[in-house]
Amino acid sequence: MTLLCRPAILSRCLPLCREIPNPRKGDPAMRKALKILLVLLLTVLVLAAAYVAYVFLAYYRIEDQQVLTVEGSVTETLRPGQTCRAISYNIGFGAYESDYSFFLDGGTQSWAWSEERLRENLDEIAALLQAENADFLLLQEVDVDATRTYHFDESAVLRAAFPDRACVYAQNYDSPFLLYPFTQPHGASRAGMLTFSRYAVSSSLRRSLPIEGGFRKFLDLDRCYSVCRLPVEGGKELVLYTLHLSAYSADGSISVEQLKLLLADMQAEYEKGNYSVAGGDFNKDLLGNSAQWFGAADREYTWAQPLPEDIFDGTGISLAAPLDEKNPVPSCRNADAPYHEGQYVLTVDGFLVSGNVTVEEAAVLDTGFAHSDHNPVSLTFTLNAG
């Protein structure tokens, strides 16, 4: 079929064709706006790529078997048959007061409330530990220079509180600047673990722990445990370990691998005839099922799994989980909200001992989570003679 273009039809179509805009002759203001938008988008992409490169380039891990400095001039030595007391306390970088929630746990805060409140809380933590007067202090999450704690050296406060103790610092966190949350970036953090001893420490070592690979390694600490060697009369040693195992992992298996490495070290010392005691934050449900003791069971919280039942088989090492069955107190609260009645709580802090160490008591010190998302835990133990 042949279509004939009549003059009347053409006269109607031509004005419409003239109204179709030519993209090459667009509105100057529109072209300028598009250019600005493209420049902004390109700038954002370049900055994002530069930040990712910075995070990757800044990442490093401290080598295994790092020799640690033992501070202080303590000379008193232990003896077989002696009873001692140790306290382990994750101080939550001094920020986790009872009204605090942390953004990585689903809460709101990324910094301590204020530098003034931070210093007051640290003074109260130091006073609490002084009043307990334990022989050994095993402390985790101690900031030495961090955006989140106003670049205040928390270790200086704790060292000043125990000037007559031997002291060992082991770094396990040195993160690049974290830009999130955007309203108050978490920033850069350098932190670690402190060990204080009333008795002489002859040497100390830092053991690096395995961590997850891929992107998750940027979310985890540079996990480790410190090893302090204390002479005991008669030629033996007390080998004291301070630890903080992984929490933010895909399925919790990496912390089991970390624990196996620690157990192998402790077993080797025990087989030499030395005493082995370890304490810290395991990030595992050390009671197996904390909900049966404290209630508030919630399947949403799966970050702290029970330890494998057979993990201690053949090691000569046993778990000393702090529990008073008549008055059970948890050692940790979930930090997705300020502390409140019915909040998810459990026990993740505790101790390991070798077969030649008798556990007299393992207990949680009930602070009501006033200073941290953890309560301190204590172990009274005896170094068996013979």
Which residues does each predicted region cover?
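Conserved beta strand-loop-helix elements of the APE1-like EEP
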Residues: A160-P163, G187-S204, Q343-T358
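Surface-exposed cleft-lining segments at the edges of enzyme active sites
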Residues: Q109-S114, V142-V144, L209-K217, H244-S253
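Beta-strand-turn-beta hairpins that frame and shape the catalytic cleft
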Residues: T77-A86, S189, M193, S197-S203, ...
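Short proline/glycine-enriched turn/loop segments at secondary-structure junctions
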Residues: R216-K217, A337-G342, D366-H371
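Short, Lys/Arg-enriched N-terminal segments with co-localized hydrophobic residues
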Residues: I9-A29
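Active-site beta-strand/loop signature of hydrolases that rely on acidic residues for catalysis
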Residues: R85-I91, N121-H151, F196, C228, ...
